[in-house]
Design a protein with these regions (language model features):
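N-terminal accessory alpha/beta regions
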Residues: 1-44
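A ubiquitous short alpha-helical element
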Residues: 4, 22, 68-71, 147, ...
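Solvent-exposed, amphipathic alpha-helical "stalk/arm" or coiled-coil-like segments used as scaffolds
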Residues: 10, 14, 55-59, 197, ...
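Active-site substrate-binding loop specific to GH73 endo-beta-N-acetylglucosaminidase modules
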Residues: 30-231, 235
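Flexible, low-complexity segments enriched for small/polar residues
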Residues: 152, 156-192, 196-343
Length: 343
């Protein structure tokens, strides 16, 4: 979908939320539940983070991933409560261990139903007593807990900061930039408004700002640029695509931990470079590169196709050396720093 969707921004945000609420099929062991979670994230990808967070806290796949099914009154499991605050909504240092214990009580009773791909609240397993969370006291349950957490000023800064980190730069935004982004996020917690605000920031297009593309984003962009739809490939080629992503260390629905995938230089290892080269060769082998082949300046033509404004002298020299073979040229261009690292 990332390679073929008419609205790639929505698919990119769906991918972002998959990494943010990182859930692995390895433990969930239900493709149906993983697909249902993916649909939920797509539905809310560009909407209100409130709606997304409310849906995710009782998402069946996430419940199984973070031991929600074993969270019951009298014997709470703290895993979901802790990760929801630390990794999904607040960040480290903005809650206490007491908050985790009390939040776990608020989330008791929710169980994933594999047969219906839904979650339901089992009243006899829910702790309906008074809880003390983040300085507030009340009979908190799942949805009221979410609203309480998202109402903290730290939450807006955290969520906006994560969007910036994954979409713009590993360097945090300046204080004035962060304030503008938080203002755009607003009380509605509007993801689309934040994205508009991000793209309006000078830093978004500053050549000094760079971000190493995640393998899945790199491959999806390459498939889209070269006009290759994964669904049109034969089984062997699709298997090779998946093997290539595995070699790069990023397979959808199989994040290494609840913290999601690595970022930045972690994707620039020697082994990753070899895997990227093989993937680029595979995609180029199925691409229609007629326009590049006919161009007098093939390096510029492939740059236009990939959305690269300019090649460095070093990359130009490398491209010149393979200009006689348009598929080899495309492979080298796809693995060049100017494409692997967006700036």
């Amino acid at each position: 979908r990332m390679a073929a969707a008419d609205l790639p921004s929505a698919e990119r945000l769906t991918w972002f939320w998959h990494g943010h609420f990182a859930t692995s099929e390895q433990k969930v062991r239900s493709p149906q539940l993983m697909l249902a979670q993916n649909r939920t994230q797509r539905e809310h990808a560009l909407g209100s983070f409130t709606d997304l967070a409310r849906a995710m806290v009782v998402d069946p796949a996430l419940l199984l991933w973070l031991d929600g099914n074993s969270n019951k009154a009298g014997k709470p499991n703290e895993n979901l409560a802790r990760e929801f605050m630390e990794l999904f909504t607040l960040g480290v240092g903005h809650y206490t261990e007491d908050d985790v214990r009390e939040a776990a009580r608020a989330l008791t009773g929710w169980t994933a139903q594999r047969d219906t791909t839904t979650a339901k609240l089992v009243p006899k397993r829910h702790d309906d007593g008074e809880k003390h969370i983040l300085g507030a006291t009340g009979d908190f349950a799942a949805q009221s807990f979410v609203d309480l957490v998202l109402g903290r000023p730290d939450s807006a800064r955290f969520v906006v900061g994560r969007l910036w980190f994954r979409l713009v730069s590993a360097e945090p935004p300046a204080a004035d930039v962060l304030n503008r982004l938080v203002a755009a996020y607003g009380s509605r917690r509007d993801v689309r408004a934040v994205l508009r605000a991000i793209t309006a920031e000078p830093a978004f297009r500053d050549s000094a700002t760079s971000l190493v593309k995640q393998p899945v984003e790199w491959l999806a962009g390459l498939l889209r640029a070269f006009g290759v739809r994964p669904g049109s490939l034969d089984e062997q080629a699709r298997t090779q695509l998946l093997a290539g992503l595995r070699g790069l260390g990023q397979v959808p629905f199989l994040p290494p931990s609840v913290g999601g995938w690595a970022a930045g230089g972690a994707w620039l290892t020697t082994s990753a470079g070899v895997a990227r080269l093989h993937l680029a060769q595979l995609v180029a082998g199925h691409a229609d590169l007629g326009a590049v082949a006919k161009a007098s300046d093939k390096a510029s033509a492939i740059g236009d196709l990939l959305g690269v404004d300019a090649w460095s002298d070093r990359t130009k020299a490398a491209l010149a050396g393979v200009a006689g073979d348009v598929r080899q040229l495309s492979t080298v261009a796809a693995c060049a720093p100017e494409y692997v690292v967006s700036g």
